[in-house]
Amino acid sequence: MKGTRFLKPACWLLCAMMLIGQLTVLASAADGSTGSSTTSSSLADIKEMLNAASYEEYRAKHADAKRATQTVEVDVCGEGAYTVKGDGFKTVEHDGVTGLYTPNTGSVTWTVEVPEDGLYAIRILYYPEEGRTTSIERVLMVNEEVPFSEARSLTLMKNWENQYQKAKVQPGKKETAEQLKAAAVAAGFTDAAVEDGEVVFAAPACMTAAMSAFCDEHLVRYFQLDIKSNELRPVSKQAPKWMTYYLRDSSGSIAENFEFFLEKGENKITLESKNEPMTIGSITLYPLADTITYEQYSQKYAGKPAGQDTVRLEAEFFTAASNITLYPLEDRSNALNSPADVTRTVLNTVGGDKWQTAGQWIELTFSVGSAGMYDIVSRFKQDVLDGISVCRAMYIYSDGLKAGDEGYYDGVPFAEARELMFNYNSSWQVSKLNSGSDKTYEVYLAADTVYTVRLEVTLGAMGEVVSEVSDVLTHINNDYLNIIKLTGASPDKYQDYGFSDTMPDTMIDMVKQARRLETLAKQLTAIAGEKSSNVATLEKIARLLKEMGTDDDDVVKNLSSLKTNIGTLGTFLSDAQTQPLQLDYIQIQPAGSKMPRANPNFLQAFAHEMKGFWQSFFRDYNSMGALEESSSESVEVWLASARDQSQVLRNLINNDYTPNTNIAVDLKLVAGGTLLPSILAESGPDVYLGLAHGDVINYAIRSALINIEGFDDFKETASHFTNAAMTVLGMEDADEIMHYYGLPETQSFPMMFVRLDVLADLDLEVPKTWDELMACIPTLQANNMQIGLTTDYKIFLYQKGGDLFADNGMRINLDSQVGLASFEKMCNLFTM
């Protein structure tokens, strides 16, 4: 055992730091209580939400309305300009701009004088206050009503920036450190300095062609390295700044900004907080202008020569991101990755399944030295969604130019940039900007202007498919519910239910939905350019619906298949709404110039794979992430889990625990079952993570563990857990004094899931107590429906105030009065 002088405090502090971060709360409401674990939505709220019109229906309702011609500025924080519901609203100032602080609960309403009837788009200047890692969510109401369902879920992103390290570049054999420094300064790294024989400089705020060439030549990296030269993921921090949000669909199904119909005169605009605080600087109602097409854009810059610069932007060094979950990733699958190295961890890409949700974005900043037309080329990989192209919207922002100047941008440069396509392929690809066809797009860039390119996840052409499939799924689900109301979940296959006579509308609707799915399958094939497993899924469900809708005899025998396919369609819908894309780099290059290769030749690929195979025998995975060698004063921690979890834990140690305690941690990833032999050999760790709670006492009674209740902050830390979670980790000694030998890593908690559509259809409120749940059973059973009840006995025991163990854990407590009563209550639920 190492470091006995630091053993107890180190073990305790490390456990507390990690476990508090992982803590999940056990929430079981007592009988008859209505705590925060239950929904507060009433039946009327649920019906309003389910029956709300979509934006498509809202636009159809106001199809004859014209766009407004004037812009209206809302007085956001003037005296008497607004009314609030809730506490915490106040006027604040950020970066010289005054705004109204809105907390994460409550609502604020502004009264706006509109000069004319018409359609208005809305933009909000906001400042995301530092808080949790989640995005900001708001509900918009116009004249005290939510105008359409999509306005219930407005998501405003925060601004996150990685804390990159200074690059350290060693001079080559034929140059000195001073010569290398001079070259770095000439390239634009003006802060370059010589330290310990290396040239050190910070990551630039804006990449230029000269900087890009210098970085490629000298393999410049801005990540912290561990003792084995593996790159470590940088810390991402919120970097609040004033940002502009244009009200649009958070799901990404609708590419255009929302337009709201407002009548002339007084109107009320309300924002209701759902998640996270923010400060509102301004709200503007403005007439939405159509974005020019690429044809119009290219005519504007017709005759412009090609630019001369080439700037490679490594995606892992993005300037900013919308979420903390967007961080650099390692990919060693290809010899042409930039950079590629199989001997160590190199964080050379960004995205993947971390960059797949609508609204997520990353930004990269650059400048070119010569004006002209440029191709924006990306090297990417999309091997997740078979037969589905993923989509990104590209926004360009220019700094220092004003509207009307050549090369000025303040959003999407042309309409097609809202739906840039990245096709499916199992290999890496390189392509110019395109919308899924052979036609590519060029952009004009002004010289010496700082440009920021934002790539945002959107559904693009898949948005219409997703919206249609969602509507079809709703119809099919309603048809299924109508059938089981008559037949029950297990119908009699020998009975003639007479579906065509008893529910003709349902039979007709199944045929209608089959035709819609057939059309959607053709549409999906056209988008992807080929048939896929997803197309086959839609066609299969369409055939099933057509059979059931046209023949009564096929309904009962296919009912279970219909239920299964409803789930399959839901899975397809979920997959189609994700847009994963792994990005290696973006290259700004002269229009028409040769694109870089996407994949290596045979010899390059063979050498890359053989080198990786050979290195796998010698790579030290245990020390990955360690910033210093193990010593007698370090704490040895064993972790029995996956490697990605060990990396997360190593980041917590490096960024939080060690800097705050000055205690080194030797983290080792081990296989399960290694603890027992190590203890027998007297070579066990100081801390072990991943031990089953049932094994803790087995080790404790054999004096293999130390008790932890003697630490000053034990009571405060243990209070974060339920008594039941701590009971299994402790035992009494001969003097009947309770000792504890560990802390829970995770806690489970029961949850109740309800079908809001079913409850609304049957006019049932969401049950909040067991009595209310019991009251729902007759109505459900009358419609051949049931409640899926839990068989977890402990929740009934705890809700009655009982304990699982008696006599301080020495015997089971199931034979007590409260234990028997709890068991009886659970059993009674299955006899109704």
Which role fits each region the language model picked out?
Residues N655-A724, D757-E765:
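Extracytoplasmic "Venus flytrap"/periplasmic binding protein-like
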Residues A30-T564, T568-S574, T578-L583:
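Extracytoplasmic
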Residues A591-E633:
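Disordered inhibitory propeptide/activation segment of secreted metzincin zinc metalloprotease zymogens
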Residues T291, D666-V670, E709-D712, L729-M832:
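Helix-loop-helix "hinge/cap" segment bordering the ligand-binding cleft or interdomain interface
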Residues S630-R643, Y657, I663-K668, V687, ...:
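Short, well-ordered beta-strand elements
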Residues S616-E636, E736-I737, A760, P778-M785:
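Immediate post-signal peptide segment of exported/extracytoplasmic ligand-binding proteins
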Residues M1-S42:
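Gram-positive cell-envelope targeting signals
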Residues T270-L271, D686-G690, G788:
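Paired acidic/hydrophobic, glycine-rich loop segments that form the ligand-binding mouth/hinge
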